Amino acid sequence: MSPIQAFGPQAENQSPPFSGHNAYRADPLLKDIAADMPRALRDDFETVGKFVASAEAQDLARIANRAVPELKTHDGYGNRIDQVDFHPSWHALMRRSVSSGLQGSVWEGRREEKGFAHQARALRFFLTAGLECGHLCPLTMTNASIAAIMASPRIEKAWAPQVVSRRYDSSNRPAMQKSGVTIGMGM
């Protein structure tokens, strides 16, 4: 015990931090579901499982849930902007989840996911939900929006590449000027 700890109250009934493992490897059901999937997908699940159980990811999730989004109605010059600013930890989680395809991998048509696209997304989603659920809401809405977008070939041509893009773009620009878009959270 360090000299500093000797003077403060000691918490004896707390579990140690739950990080540093692999959430995918630790779940026999997930491994069983993925057993017949291509090796590339199983490797991806390993990567997601390691990240979501890392201390870094858990810190991002904790901070993202404590740092409330802030509405900025005007810029410094009095111009109306109606912009919502999220903490960088929120953007880090979004960036990671978008790069994993949670916003639209089922619509990409990737060869390694052929026949497994929905199951692969569900497995990644399940693992990520164990970390933080709030950022999954806009990703779920984005994934669901593609079916409606596909109802119009003209709209699909314009929007689908932006929506299924695995590049998260948090900039406050028109959608067609962004490298990727999410659809949702316009409440």
Regions from the PLM with identified roles:
Residues 91-187:
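Glycine-rich flavin
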